[in-house]
Amino acid sequence: MRKFTLNIFTLSLGLAVMPMVEAAPTAQQQLLEQVRLGEATHREDLVQQSLYRLELIDPNNPDVVAARFRSLLRQGDIDGAQKQLDRLSQLAPSSNAYKSSRTTMLLSTPDGRQALQQARLQATTGHAEEAVASYNKLFNGAPPEGDIAVEYWSTVAKIPARRGEAINQLKRINADAPGNTGLQNNLALLLFSSDRRDEGFAVLEQMAKSNAGREGASKIWYGQIKDMPVSDASVSALKKYLSIFSDGDSVAAAQSQLAEQQKQLADPAFRARAQGLAAVDSGMAGKAIPELQQAVRANPKDSEALGALGQAYSQKGDRANAVANLEKALALDPHSSNNDKWNSLLKVNRYWLAIQQGDAALKANNPDRAERLFQQARNVDNTDSYAVLGLGDVAMARKDYPAAERYYQQTLRMDSGNTNAVRGLANIYRQQSPEKAEAFIASLSASQRRSIDDIERSLQNDRLAQQAEALENQGKWAQAAALQRQRLALDPGSVWITYRLSQDLWQAGQRSQADTLMRNLAQQKSNDPEQVYAYGLYLSGHDQDRAALAHINSLPRAQWNSNIQELVNRLQSDQVLETANRLRESGKEAEAEAMLRQQPPSTRIDLTLADWAQQRRDYTAARAAYQNVLTREPANADAILGLTEVDIAAGDKAAARSQLAKLPATDNASLNTQRRVALAQAQLGDTAAAQRTFNKLIPQAKSQPPSMESAMVLRDGAKFEAQAGDPTQALETYKDAMVASGVTTTRPQDNDTFTRLTRNDEKDDWLKRGVRSDAADLYRQQDLNVTLEHDYWGSSGTGGYSDLKAHTTMLQVDAPYSDGRMFFRSDFVNMNVGSFSTNADGKWDDNWGTCTLQDCSGNRSQSDSGASVAVGWRNDVWSWDIGTTPMGFNVVDVVGGISYSDDIGPLGYTVNAHRRPISSSLLAFGGQKDSPSNTGKKWGGVRADGVGLSLSYDKGEANGVWASLSGDQLTGKNVEDNWRVRWMTGYYYKVINQNNRRVTIGLNNMIWHYDKDLSGYSLGQGGYYSPQEYLSFAIPVMWRERTENWSWELGASGSWSHSRTKTMPRYPLMNLIPTDWQEEAARQSNDGGSSQGFGYTARALLERRVTSNWFVGTAIDIQQAKDYAPSHFLLYVRYSAAGWQGDMDLPPQPLIPYADW
């Protein structure tokens, strides 16, 4: 372990010192540098000494062999040089050393020397590109080292496009082989000519260190500084020069010049003049102007200072002052050597002064003056394009687009790089059509297109915006969002593109991403009123009014614009109305109205009050509120339509038509207004007019982005289509309504998807909830269903007449018809009441038939079976059916019923008339036949003919009440007539009241009265429970729930009941009794009495969706009460032809035996 630690330390130390080791030059590198130095300075002794040592240290180094090769070649030893070249080819055939040496060897041949001479001739005659091509051909891509390399790159430097490359190569050669004065001389001149003065002086300073180059460096250096204008900079430059060079003619001249300049600069006026002139030459107008102004003040007739001042103003862009000073300079010294320069500058500044003044006039909306100035500029210089451009801008200001187009085109012919002309033409063509503008832009060069990149982006943005809007109208939100992203890339940070993108993402279901985009925008542009307004709209549009107001209030009120103020007013009004609506929904409508009436007069509030009055059928108050609106706004469509709807509700169709006719004719009516018109037309019976309105309105709503308005149009349009007899089209319209209301972002394409979307959602608003519910109701109304069910039930009793075991097999087919559903029903019923117990003689004397008068004998077992059929139809208002009791029973009758349902506000009611069988026993339901040993007569088959009224009150809140009152005449074959009145009522409280789960507890009460007690089974009796007094109270508890594919109900109740019966004759119809037995029959009776006690019920019902088309279910219930204890068990299967993936029924809805309707 210790050894390992030491090794790690050693390795770390080695790695740490490695860079320092590599940084230090090796002996070989130092000797090779001495070789190159000796070659550059033509010191062969230094070359030989270095090569001798190198060949001892590293004889096979390609660079060493190449150096020996060059040495031999310089000595004229061609054979020796060739041997070294051959050796180098073996050592490093791919090295630069070998390639360079091979080229050098070639140059020693006659052909090589001739080719080199030709290249040099081309270079000296000014054919630099041809010379470089010849060099490249000769060198084959590998220039030799030394003077030939300097010669090659000096020639390359004569090609302007490659000058920088050549300078860098010459600097490299100078660094590798310092001391080549010819190279340094040439390199310095190239650097100065390329305005790389500091680098040039650095080369000269290097050159001055050698005796061979010092004099040349001094001359070049002095030549670069001697003509500098007198200034501190020129003095500094001379001092720097004299610090490096100490002798020679240039030094003497520099010393004299330095003394003179120092003397001149001691004069403040001269110093200011000199510094100003120097600053002008350096392009430093800001520094030059105050210096030259001082000089001119000292000598107002100094034409050179005036001219320089004019030049300085020109550099600064101050055309007016430039013109004034240049004119003075020319007037003072018409023959100055600077006149040509001053005249040129004067012309330029007069031209641009006129252009500037023309632009200013155009900006001041004075096109006539602008035109004169641009024309004046054109007269000064008719070769420049900007005067013509200005005339084009004047034509644009006058909206003379043909003239503007001509001027801009002329501008481009004069100067294809004039981007303003390109922009002007692009704007003209954009006004004509986007396509023409895009075609023009496509014809431009790359540089011209770059100059109007913003216009091209804007055109692309407009095109993408149109495409996105088309996709939004089709409900293709994700695709629209992709285009909005492209728009945002063209215009990053755009408030309204970000808003549109966020809206599309929200509609596409990507709500988190949409929220993030808007939040980021708010952070980036926190003080931008447009951002605040857009984010406020976004939040309020997604039911976040309070958040919208909070965001708006983060902006100082002084920065609010009219849009923000209008939005705030609307949101505050919404909050007031929201509070009022909550009060109203909680049953405090009077308080809600009082609160609204305390608000400032508002059309919106008056319309709300009118709507509330209309809903509670207070038509007088509704009319008054609508009239208040019309007093302020006589053409208010909402108020006119409101009065129309009030008149329709009041049944005054003539007044309604009169109101509808007052509606202002306009092509700009909102979708909601048109929807209400169509509904009014339909309610007035103008079906054709309503059809035309909806036919025009529905396509408009489909083309709109999702909104409450378009969703309501499509919802009501679908209802109208269904009512008009086109339910198939109505279902298609409901699919569009789902998209418009935000139920889904994609229109459903199949029944499973469509019906799955009808499932309730706790997060839905009232509109989504209504669209789902209405679509589900119509779909199920149009579906074909087949249900097969088997029900077993029974109750214990006496064998032969009341020990009942019953089986009912039901088959029902439901199909759409008109606006309701028709059905066909068949029940196969088997009832078995057991067998009589016999005495030793095989007879029985039970209280059945006439057995108490004469012992009966014969068939002990009592049962019967038969099949009933029925047809019927029902919708939301009417329901009727007609059918039979089971055919095959002893007594068969036609039965049925009819009912009508409606509501009065929150109170629902149903009235009905009916003829129904009493099915609680075989005797009451199907009749029995007295023993053949006695009378053999049939009796029973009791039917209830009567009417009923049912009431219910349930506003969807926690409490509900129901009640039922009915009266019936009870008759049967050979049964004493009877009648009954029944009252039932109940209250329930919803402990849990959710869409898919409900738990209730309640209190029920029943009061029954039968005229006679005919519960016996003797001949003439009815065999049905018929107390003269019956009172019961029950406390039911119910749990109902559904999931995606299950639905169930579990219920139980505890009850207390009291009943009383009168003593009744056992044989109430003496005409049925043989004469010999009548005396005994008259003496017999069924004793009356009273009883009371407790009971219970338990019920479980379960249904499962197996597939979209198949459903199965089962149920069981157990009842135990005084004098009544039936129990049931059933199984059923239901088939849906169209398939159903919507909500499961809650609770499940098995078939009810037709006899129990």
Swiss-Prot record:
Keyword Repeat listed: yes
Single biological process term from Gene Ontology: cellulose biosynthetic process
Residues of the signal peptide: 1-23
Pathway participation: Glycan metabolism; bacterial cellulose biosynthesis
SMART domains the UniProt entry points to: TPR (SM00028)
Keywords tagged on the record: Cellulose biosynthesis, Repeat, Signal, TPR repeat
TPR repeats: 62-95, 112-145, 269-302, 303-336, 351-384, 385-418, 461-494, 603-636, 710-744
Keyword check for Lyase: no
GO cellular component, one term: cell outer membrane
Annotated family: Belongs to the AcsC/BcsC family.
NCBIfam families for this protein: PRK11447.1
Function: Required for maximal bacterial cellulose synthesis.
The protein, known as: Cellulose synthase operon protein C
